[in-house]
Design a protein with these regions (language model features):
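Radical SAM enzyme [4Fe-4S]-AdoMet core and its adjacent flexible, acidic
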Residues: 2-4, 10, 33-36, 255, ...
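Short, charged low-complexity linear segments at domain edges
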Residues: 129-151, 371-379, 418-437
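Conserved alpha-helical substructure of the radical SAM core
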Residues: 102, 113-116, 120, 124-252, ...
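Flexible mid-to-C-terminal extensions adjoining Fe-S/redox cofactors in radical SAM and related proteins
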Residues: 6, 11, 405-462
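Long, charge-rich, low-complexity alpha-helical segments
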Residues: 59-151
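Short cysteine clusters
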Residues: 160, 167, 171-174, 391-394, ...
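Acidic, low-complexity/disordered tracts enriched in E/D and polar residues
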Residues: 1-80
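A sequence-level detector of short linear motifs
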Residues: 57-58, 242, 408
């Protein structure tokens, strides 16, 4: 179905690029909204609202126009505290804008829609039931309308520098170790700043700073500060998260930090990280929490750290409420025999997760399992997970290698995996290249498998 002339005109003037607004930026209920246009607007093709870089919601054309009108009305108040009277004026302006596009709709109805939309957004980001039904976003069906992924992982730190190992630990399961594109020469500060602007121009709303170990770069705070338009996350081993660095990252508007914590047992953690850094990691988590950053932990699960419930209990005691866990990504260090020997069977992995999920529910924690294909959908749902992981390569996420090479995902670092260079190649050519389209088409099947290969032991194992 086609749009009206008024709708088409408004969308052309106000929604031809990604729009962004942050509500209550200094408060506990901060809400960051990115409104993403589709390639070609149609009445039956939704726009997309990305909330805090996590919740992906389809919006009708009318609600997208209403939200864009609100964003326009909020622009003069960017970075300022908004009084109740000012907010009433902002809402009235948004309603007036939408009413000009939809003159046959009563302003009271538009005002009610605006309130329902914002109330639903806040409920979803708080993990609550929204007052109106929200249709889940089917990325597989929506893939052909996308012009860019929703997240780009920037591998700002290389695994090697000047011919030597360039990480402060050597994790047994490191996906970037022994991979050609994980060890290329790093871009300098100005080049990474240019990459960040390229991502914004492409309409990518979320950036993750990762590596290698991104905290080994002296310019990390500057890069994060330059990315304030995006929802930003830092993936780190946490060892260099001093109090001062955490405060600087918070001041630079970093949205969240994910720290790899292998185990509550110091000896096991150090064995898996290949360095005696347990105390540093715990200190880093505490510093990040104290600085007010949104902190989560990530734990790749194997036969050596099966007491995952104890790891969650430790995280809980440190003030962390969010956790992700996974099997072993079958690439890099996880393809070596020592790592393969620790892979868990589906039965063993299920036995690890069941008590962990019970602990999380009892202690108001949230866990996401992120490895496609490791466990059947029915098992994950029975365990209590609300989402079944699926491959997002060239669909929901992509990555930029240390030298600017664009990759299907941050683990896809093997030779000849590059899809172009973000500094030298136009984005539309990278996104629409045959190799990128092939990977995206596989991801869009939503078959809950990892395109990098088999991850689960065929038989036997632990």
């Amino acid at each position: 179905m086609f749009l009206s002339r008024a709708e088409s005109s408004y969308l052309h003037q106000h929604l031809s690029v990604v729009r962004h607004v942050t509500l209550d930026p200094e408060g506990p209920g901060v809400l960051r909204i990115h409104l993403l246009p589709c390639k070609k607007a149609r009445r039956n093709v939704p726009f997309v609202a990305l909330l805090n870089g996590q919740d992906i919601l389809p919006l009708s054309v009318s609600w997208a126009i209403l939200l864009a009108g609100l964003m326009d009305a909020l622009q003069p108040f960017e970075g300022k505290e908004i009084t109740e009277d000012q907010w009433a004026g902002i809402a009235a302006q948004a309603v007036e804008t939408a009413a000009a596009v939809y003159p046959k709709t009563a302003p009271d109805q538009i005002r009610a829609d605006l309130n329902a939309m914002l109330t639903s957004f806040r409920a979803l980001t708080a993990g609550q039931e929204p007052p109106v039904h929200v249709q889940p976003m089917d990325l597989g069906a929506y893939a052909r309308y996308m012009a860019a992924p929703h997240r780009m992982d920037l591998m700002v730190s290389s695994m090697e520098k000047d011919g030597a190992w360039h990480c402060n630990q050597k994790c047994l399961h490191c996906y970037a170790a022994n991979q050609p594109l994980g060890a290329v020469k790093e871009l300098d500060t100005d080049q990474w700043l240019a990459v960040i602007q390229k991502c914004r121009a492409a309409g990518i709303p979320q950036l993750t700073f990762t590596g290698g170990e991104p905290t080994m770069r002296n310019d990390l705070v500057s890069l994060v500060h330059a990315a304030q338009w995006f929802v930003t996350r830092l993936n780190t081993n946490g060892r260099m998260l001093t109090s001062a660095l955490c405060r600087e990252l918070a001041d630079a508007s970093l949205d969240s930090v994910q720290v790899t914590l292998y185990s509550a047992d110091e000896a096991i953690h150090n064995t898996l990280m290949g360095a005696p850094g347990y105390a540093d990691t715990i200190s880093g988590i505490l510093n990040a929490v104290e600085a007010g950053l949104n902190v989560s932990i990530n734990t790749p699960l194997c036969s050596l750290n099966q007491d995952y419930t104890a790891t969650l209990a430790l995280a809980n005691s440190l003030g962390v409420r969010y956790a992700t866990c996974s099997g072993l990504i079958p690439t890099g260090g996880a393809e070596t025999d020592p790592s393969k020997a620790t892979r868990l069977t589906p039965e063993a992995l299920t036995a690890v997760l069941r008590p962990a999920m019970a602990y999380a529910e009892q202690n108001h924690m949230e866990i996401n399992f992120t490895s496609p294909g490791w466990l059947p959908d029915a098992v994950l749902l029975d365990l209590g997970f609300t989402q079944v992981p699926s491959c997002g390569a060239c669909l929901s996420n992509m990555a930029v290698a240390p030298d600017g090479t664009v990759l299907p995902c941050q683990s896809w670092l093997r030779e000849n995996a590059g899809l172009g260079n973000i500094l030298h190649d136009p984005w539309h050519k990278i996104w629409n290249a045959p190799a990128c389209r092939r990977v995206r088409e596989e991801s869009a099947k939503m078959e809950h498998i990892c395109q990098l290969g088999t991850t689960v032991p065929a038989q036997g194992g632990l």
